[in-house]
């Protein structure tokens, strides 16, 4: 069952019990998810049907279409039904229909509804076109890996965050030439809270760059070009968290992104987005990512920036179990689950390195197929660049000793400023030195029987199992109200975006769920 040799002497019966509890939690929540849709799920359907662009006021056409249907109390049937019916009635394309709605020339909800079977058949046939494009993107990615080969060992993941997509491209190309394997374009501060996706190439962001489809296209093009120069496929990463999770997943699938931040709980805890909204949105976004071959990264590392990494380690493991089960329900295979964790214990903690090693090895053994995402120290980086570089070196050592996969490079200037190109070069050099010098160390080391490292892992697993038992009894929504994750309490009916949640009609239809889950 477990392909990774167990060095921690973990109780795998307990692992299976914990996994079963997480599955029960996910299935319980999934019942709620499947009875509801949201405005952004329906906007994602519009985008996947080919609706794009903005009106004269810069309002995206998918928003105009979905708001129009919602105002006329029709969203419970799904946008696909109204668009397909309008195509049958008018002979126009979805894009032309959206433009007609924007111009006030068409009311989708007043058109005579054709036979429902005919409408669903039309929606399905229209959806197949985009699904084929996404399949094609997946095969392009696979053929590039066949051509260049894929790297074994940790992937060096770096971020660019200038606010200007053209400057981001300059920095990303430099990072790729320095040895980066994954480029993540950080989003501008607050984009999570926009209930629409901006349009076009952007040059003004704060702490990051707007996620737009054009920005995705530009960066993908640049990375393909530099990838051909350096002889490897450079993975591109962005963020589908916030109020537009499935829309950004759809845009990423269309533009061939490779990695997406896509956590089931992050938006609830750290962006105060309503929990009902987030749970529905994460499901469709993961269906899209699963189908597109995109690796998702989850955000457990964020718990450790608000809660103590030593005391709350079990909440990270419990969340990893839950994220895994929600991903499986959305058809996302284990090989695409970049479950997150982080090297965030206080450097003053005695034996802290051993505890970090235990936690990382435990994640590796419990999720043997997952391309685990391991985050660098940030919370206890002080601006002392020399100590910071050493903290990052210890983090790099844990990665290679425990075979982490997606290795987010720490920056020596963390807590001072967003990284300069020179900072990135030093961080890449630090990691490459350690990964090369210690390449086979994980095959050479065992942990002392009943020693500190084994005992710590057993203790964290037991606590995670107890927590999952508690969550199973309470249900996920009540658990989030109690503040168990990251010490953050959120009300079930509070937060942003609840007014965008709609109950489905019995004739509701989303053709992409059917096509993508039955791949």
Curated annotation (Swiss-Prot):
Per UniProt, what is one GO molecular function of this protein? cobalamin binding
Q: What does this protein do?
A: Catalyzes the migration of the L-beta-lysine and D-lysine epsilon amino group to the delta carbon to produce 3,5-diaminohexanoate and 2,5-diaminohexanoate, respectively.
Q: Short name of one Pfam family for this protein?
A: Lys-AminoMut_A
The gene name on file is kamD
Activity control, as annotated, is:
Rapidly inactivated in the presence of D-lysine and to a lesser extent in the absence of adenosylcobalamin (Adocbl). Activity is stable in the presence of Adocbl when D-lysine is absent. Adocbl imparts thermal stability at 37 degrees Celsius.
Species of provenance = Acetoanaerobium sticklandii (strain ATCC 12662 / DSM 519 / JCM 1433 / CCUG 9281 / NCIMB 10654 / HF)
Q: What name does the UniProt record give this protein?
A: Lysine 5,6-aminomutase alpha subunit
Q: Which cofactor does it need?
A: adenosylcob(III)alamin; pyridoxal 5'-phosphate
Keyword Disulfide bond applies: no
> What family does this belong to?
Belongs to the KamD family.
EC class (word): isomerase
Q: For this protein, what reaction is catalysed? A: (3S)-3,6-diaminohexanoate = (3S,5S)-3,5-diaminohexanoate; D-lysine = (2R,5S)-2,5-diaminohexanoate
Task: Tell me which EC number(s) this protein carries.
Answer: 5.4.3.3
Q: Which of this chain's residues are annotated to bind adenosylcob(III)alamin?
A: 57-59
């Amino acid at each position: 069952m477990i392909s990774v040799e167990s060095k921690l002497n973990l109780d795998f019966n307990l692992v299976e019990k914990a996994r079963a509890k997480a599955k029960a939690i996910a299935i319980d929540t999934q019942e709620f998810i499947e009875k509801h849709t949201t405005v952004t799920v329906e906007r994602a359907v519009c985008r996947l049907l080919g609706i794009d662009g903005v009106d004269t006021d810069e309002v995206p056409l998918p928003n105009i279409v979905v708001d129009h249907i919602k105002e006329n109390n029709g969203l419970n049937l799904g946008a696909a039904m109204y668009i397909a019916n309008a195509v049958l009635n008018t002979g126009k394309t979805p894009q032309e229909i959206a433009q007609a709605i924007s111009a006030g020339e068409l009311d989708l909800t007043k058109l005579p509804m054709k036979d429902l079977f005919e409408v669903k058949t039309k929606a399905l046939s229209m959806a197949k076109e985009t699904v084929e494009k996404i399949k094609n993107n997946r095969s392009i990615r696979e053929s590039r890996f066949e051509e260049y080969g894929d790297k074994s060992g940790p992937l060096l993941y770096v971020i660019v965050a200038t606010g200007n997509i053209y400057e981001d491209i300059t920095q990303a190309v430099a990072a790729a030439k320095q040895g980066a394997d994954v480029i993540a374009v950080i989003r501008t501060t607050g984009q999570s809270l926009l209930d629409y996706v901006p349009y076009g190439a952007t040059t003004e962001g704060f702490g990051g760059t707007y996620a737009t489809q054009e920005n995705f296209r530009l960066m993908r093009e640049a990375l393909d070009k530099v990838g051909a120069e350096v002889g490897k496929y450079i993975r591109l990463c962005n963020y589908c968290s916030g109020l537009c999770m499935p829309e950004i997943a759809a845009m990423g699938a269309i533009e061939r992104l490779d990695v997406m931040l896509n956590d089931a709980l992050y938006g609830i805890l750290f962006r105060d987005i309503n929990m009902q909204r987030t749970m529905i949105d994460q499901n469709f976004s993961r269906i899209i990512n699963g189908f597109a071959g995109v690796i998702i990264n989850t955000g457990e590392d964020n718990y450790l920036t608000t809660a103590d990494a030593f005391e709350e380690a079990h909440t990270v493991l419990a969340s990893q179990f839950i994220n895994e089960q929600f991903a499986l329900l959305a058809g996302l295979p284990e090989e695409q689950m970049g479950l997150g964790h982080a090297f965030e214990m206080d450097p003053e903690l005695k034996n802290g390195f051993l505890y970090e090693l235990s936690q990382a090895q435990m994640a590796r053994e419990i999720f043997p197929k997952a391309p685990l995402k391991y985050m660098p120290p940030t919370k206890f980086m002080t601006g002392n660049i020399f100590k910071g570089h050493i903290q990052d070196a210890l983090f790099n050592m844990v990665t290679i000793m425990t075979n982490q996969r997606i290795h987010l490079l720490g920056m020596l200037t963390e807590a001072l400023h967003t990284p300069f190109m020179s900072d990135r070069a030093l961080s890449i050099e630090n990691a490459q030195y350690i990964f090369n010098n210690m390449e086979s160390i994980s095959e050479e080391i065992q942990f002392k029987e009943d020693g500190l490292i084994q005992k710590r892992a057993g203790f964290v697993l037991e606590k995670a199992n107890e927590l999952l038992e508690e969550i199973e009894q309470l249900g996920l929504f009540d658990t989030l109200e109690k503040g168990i994750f990251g010490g953050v309490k959120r009300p079930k009916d509070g937060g942003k975006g609840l007014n965008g949640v709609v109950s489905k009609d019995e004739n509701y239809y989303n053709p992409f769920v059917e096509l993508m889950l039955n791949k």
